[in-house]
Amino acid sequence: MAEAYIVEAVRTPVGRRGGGLGAVHPADLGAHVLTALVARAGIDPAAVDDVVFGCLDAVGPQAGDIARTCWLAAGLPEEVPGVTVDRQCGSSQQAVHFAAQAVLSGTQDLVVAGGVQNMSQIPIAFASRQAAEPLGLTDGPFLGSTGWRARYGDQPVNQFTGAEMIAAKWGIGREEQEQFALGSHRRAVRAIDTGRFARETVPYGEVAVDEGPRRDTTPARMAALKPVLDGGTITAACSSQVSDGAAALLLASERAVRDHGLRPRARVHHLSVRGEDPIRMLSAPIPATAHALKRTGLTIDAIDLVEINEAFAPVVLAWLKETGADPEKVNVNGGAIALGHPLGATGARLMTTLLHELERTGGRYGLQTMCEGGGQANVTIIERL
């Protein structure tokens, strides 16, 4: 059976909104990790078959197939193509899936997968709101569709509403959310201070570490914040941060490993994606994880480490309740609440962190999943070699 191997994985530090990466052109962020990836892997970049990048809100500096632009901005060979993927927040995890599938199919041997996002320059959902308004398009991507309205009516399609629905369904109160968020910051600060991210991170200028983790946050400060929605439980403290960053991985076939003298660090054991209620939107990692475990015959206890995106605290807390996973194996170095969530780059960032942490701890299996717009979730299981 064919295999898809992960050979290398790197990322920028994650920048805070308006922080050290805020003024950097997104193509230059992507070029930075591509340059580092090629150098670390020691490959001839002309041997790469394709570059698959995730990116949302593809307008302005993120428009025009930014995967291709990043590669060219890095000064890499013009004959190598690039394609940009949008599966909402799971875009660069899907990029890894597409890269692995190309390798597994035997049609390609060396594929770069990754993602980039500069949310300081292009705000979230800009493409569906502000960019469309000058054209007189004010209904967003859903309400103007007669088929959508016939099926879902005029229910709000909103991530905050979805997070509140999860909190209500699984009985997750504000205090539980804030305790989880506090733990995310503490884990992230510990990871930075002990150098756990050093191998995976490529500094950009003076930005050498993730800017998001708050050393001084306290339960009292979190409790003082107002909910985003009236009468709700979700606050900024329990939500992922607006961020900038990029990440990239190199996937290779057995033939490429042999021909280029590469060292496989992990193999892709499983990849899948599932969907459910697009209004609740953010709970799809639960059925998607169950599906992946059933397909592989693995139990949740067999998974050594999990990276699940902390879009909102209830997303992870509901997933923990349903899967019975050990919280000490989940987001051990913090998550998006502390580290940030540069949308189209986050999937590749999570996979990069998962690979390096498996190597640090000696674990065998790592599972990555994340909630996505439209009520979807990717799941990837890798096996450290």
Segments predicted by a language model, with ranges:
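Conserved beta-ketoacyl condensing-enzyme motif
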Residues: 22-111, 116-134, 201-209, 279, ...
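Conserved catalytic cysteine-centered active-site region
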Residues: 24, 55-109, 153-159, 216-241, ...
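Short, well-ordered amphipathic alpha-helical segments that serve as non-catalytic structural scaffolds
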Residues: 27-42, 66-70, 95, 159-166, ...
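Condensing-enzyme catalytic core mediating Claisen C-C bond formation in acyl metabolism
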Residues: 1-25, 36, 220-283, 287, ...
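N-terminal extracellular/periplasmic Venus flytrap/periplasmic-binding protein-like
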Residues: 11-12, 23-27, 31-32, 40, ...
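Active-site pocket-lining segment
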Residues: 162-164, 197-200, 204, 269-338
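Active-site-proximal alpha-helical scaffold in enzymes
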Residues: 87-117, 167-196, 248-255, 342-361, ...
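Flexible glycine-/small-residue-enriched beta->alpha junction loops
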Residues: 110-165
